[in-house]
Structures are given as C-alpha cells and as structure tokens.
Amino acid sequence: MAKKNKPTECPAGEKWAVPYADFLSLLLALFIALYAISAVNKSKVEALKTEFIKIFNYAPKPEAMQPVVVIPPDSGKEEEQMASESSKPASQNTETKATIARKGEGSVLEQIDQGSVLKLPSSLLFENATSDAINQDMMLYIERIAKIIQKLPKRVHINVRGFTDNTPLNKTRFKSHYELAANRAYRVMKVLIQYGVDPNQLSFSSYGSTNPIAPNDSLENRMKNNRVEIFFSTDANDLSKIHSILDEEFNPHKQQE
C-alpha cells in the first residue's frame, strides 16, 4: 500500500500576512482619497481626515488662521499697468452717484469695534473666478471709494485684505490661494493710490482660503468667501466720525434723499 505524501509546508510560514495586510490598508487609504477628491466638500474632507487618523494614527495639522503677508505699498511699480486699468471713456464721468452705487450692489459695509469693514465680492471686482484683473465696470466704484477715503481723518489706516474660496487653482498662473488673494488685494490698493489715496494710509494682506465666512459647500457660499475686504481702523476718538461718514456714503437710502 502506497504511503500518503505529507503536505508541503511553506518555509516562510505566515509571515506574508503582515506586509499583505499593510498593502491592503494603503490601498484602502488610496481609494478613500480618490473618492474624496473626486467631489470635494466639507463632509468628505472630514471623513478623509477621520479615516487617515484611524489607519495611520495621524492627526492632520489645522490650517493657519493668520495672514501670510502684510505689506506696505512700494514706490512706483506697475504704474503704467494700473493707469491703463483706470483709463475709461469720458462719457462715464457723467454717471450719477446712483448709477455708480448700482455697480457696487453686493458690497456690504459692517461696523465693528475697531472700525469698519467694506466687503466686496470678487465676482463683482474681477473678470473671472481665478483672475486678478479688475473689471473695468468697477473702476468708477473704486474711484468713489477712494474719494470717500480722502474725506476720512489722516489717522485712519486702510488695510486691503484678499480672501479666496477653496476651489483648486487648476490651469492658472497662481501657485496658491495666498498668491491669488495677495495679487487681488494689491491690485485694489494700487487703484486706490491711482485715485489719490495717500499711500502712507494703505497696506494689504492675503488670507488665501483661510477665514471663510461660510462653509465652502455650495456655489453661493464660495462666492461669499471669494472676496476683498477694505478694513478701516483708527483710535477710539475717530470711530464715531468714520462710522458716520461711511454709513452716509454707502447707505443707498441716504444717497437718494
């Protein structure tokens, strides 16, 4: 009677199971990442963070909430470029205050303890969602803002702040949201200088996609976050005067009286 052959034992035993399990974990993480970035929204990003914490026992660092740059204006670069942006037909000078105000519909003036903030949607100011070129139709409105600033006390400091949403900057010349926001704030500041605002009163900041005022989960909210803010700050003695002047100038009901 023939002897039964004993089953061949693997000399490595079950050592293959450990790297195989690691491989499956990495593969799972990859598919989770691909799924999340296919349609980015806040809930999916949070789910992705949770899965990475579970798989790798790693907690992602929170985004910085401080501006990347606060830069006072330089001497005279891009003067010719900004001059071409500010050029407009003479017929536009006959437009009434009400017409100019309509160009700024969508802007919001808020009074705060430190001063006032004028919020301007980027969709109003710039040619498209990833551009830093100011819309020519908005030049008269920015000129009006400059004239209002010139009525304020010289002690008032104006900081032009750029913000974006979190939409990926694919196929653009900007390497980051900070760069896009900085360029936009700088452009608005240069136009204000072009229209007579004292450069010593001005600076600009870039916050990139940080400090959103609404969740980036819809087109409407992303449009709110994609903005330029003009922040007026001064000491307590001038606050009431600033509030009064800005409220009178930017309140459409008072303009019609």
UniProtKB/Swiss-Prot annotation:
What SUPFAM superfamilies has UniProt attached to this entry?
Answer: OmpA-like
Q: Which residues form the OmpA-like domain?
A: 113-236
Instruction: List GO terms (cellular component aspect).
Output: plasma membrane
Gene3D superfamilies in UniProt: OmpA-like domain
Membrane topology according to the record:
Single-pass type II membrane protein
Query: What are the Polar residues biased-composition ranges?
Result: 83-97
- Name one process (GO BP) from the record: chemotaxis
Question: For side Periplasmic, which residue ranges?
Answer: 38-257
Ranges in a coiled coil = none
Q: Where is region (Disordered) located?
A: 74-100
Check the UniProt entry and state the signal peptide residues, or none.
none
Membrane spanning segments where? 17-37
- Where are the Cytoplasmic topological domains? 1-16
Where in or outside the cell it occurs: the entry states: Cell inner membrane
**Keywords recorded for this protein, A-Z:** Cell inner membrane, Cell membrane, Chemotaxis, Flagellar rotation, Membrane, Transmembrane, Transmembrane helix
Role according to the record: MotA and MotB comprise the stator element of the flagellar motor complex. Required for the rotation of the flagellar motor. Might be a linker that fastens the torque-generating machinery to the cell wall.
Family stated for the protein in its record: Belongs to the MotB family.
The identity of this protein, by name, is: Motility protein B
Q: Which gene encodes it?
A: motB
